[in-house]
Amino acid sequence: MNAAVIDSKHSQDFIVADLSLADWGRKELDIAETEMPGLVQIREEYKAQQPLKGARVAGSLHMTIQTGVLIETLKALGADVRWASCNIFSTQDHAAAAIAKGGTPVFAFKGESLDEYWEFSHRIFEWPNGEFANMILDDGGDATLLLILGSKAEKDRSVISKPTNEEEVALYKSIARHLDADPVWYSTRLAHIKGVTEETTTGVHRLYQMEKEGRLPFPAINVNDSVTKSKFDNLYGCRESLVDGIKRATDVMIAGKIAVVAGYGDVGKGCAQSLRGLGATVWVTEIDPICALQAAMEGYRVVTMEYAADKADIFVTATGNYHVIGHDHMKAMRHNAIVCNIGHFDSEIDVASTRQYTWENIKPQVDHIIFPDGKRVILLAEGRLVNLGCATGHPSFVMSNSFTNQTLAQIELFVEGSKYENKVYVLPKQLDEKVARLHLARIGANLTELTSEQAGYIGVDKNGPFKPNHYRY
């Protein structure tokens, strides 16, 4: 790789912001490894077997330092990898540089345009020497969507003829351009995919929809619903990274403010805890009576967005839904209200409706939306993931849980893929418990061991699994 590659955003080898950041990135990768015991131990356990030898992984997941450790783990187990970020703002440029310098084709930099984002999503499927990706590692489902929608458009271009938002404009234009060059670009690549492992709630929802409709073209493992992912990454990760993003972006004092968390799933629970821990009065909006009751029993006030809009100071969406905060909500907000999203896509806040007003950029990923009456609303990360757009995402330790699950899921689908139908699966309980076990020593936790008599009394193997699949942690 030569100097031209460093400066060009049109290289066929990789596209990163600045390769000179690689040494900094390598130092942070080394530090992160000390906080990612699951991935490190999986490398040691499987490196001799090389279970991913022959796997060509197309990865679409936030290109962070922690993701760099995941990529190097996949490669240590035999995989070839090409990588793009799954969000235009989430890349850490020094991480991308370090991974690119290490020989992995990476197509990611912080602040991509939507056109660049979808071009990079294509690049992870463009393998040299006539080869094709045979595995997808996805976060949010965009890589999976790209091949499936593109294959559909090969037969009927009308499916990409009516975009409804700026994201679809860029996506459809990108697909049309590739079809003009190769009318079977997508179906050719789709035919080689053995399966996908999906990281997040939003992407999993897409997979289940396709399974229900009979449109899922390959097996999928739902990594998100592994207990050691959803109850750790989603809850404890967001509990730390949400306020990190808000405070880096705004320097606001959270104590004494009224903060609204839209959605009280695992992500919302972590967000509410962190805001209350810093002294905010936390209100929750919910559609689900069970989650609403949970929030109320934890001492949060459960309200509607219509009620809260003109009263609260900080708004956080964590629903995975559409237009949870709409134009009229923002129009009603107080001067300098802070609005942000920690769900995967930018559709939770109706950002498009505010483009009619004046925007004033304060610094990267921090904008004032100036309404006609002079009131300003502070929008973070343009409504995209605030913890990755305005900070560095979840801590390494909790991401080790998630990425150990991802690695085990990739191994399972690649090695045992023939036994799976085109359905969505979760990892077995034994592997979930294994992931947790790998992380205990790092934080000084010691397990109590059942005696044979105790195991027999409750009807479990003394080495686990300890809970039935229906158990709710």
Swiss-Prot record:
Its cofactor is NAD(+). It is found in: Cytoplasm. May play a key role in the regulation of the intracellular concentration of adenosylhomocysteine. Belongs to the adenosylhomocysteinase family. This is Adenosylhomocysteinase. It catalyses: S-adenosyl-L-homocysteine + H2O = L-homocysteine + adenosine. It comes from the Bacteria. One of its GO terms (cellular component) is cytosol.
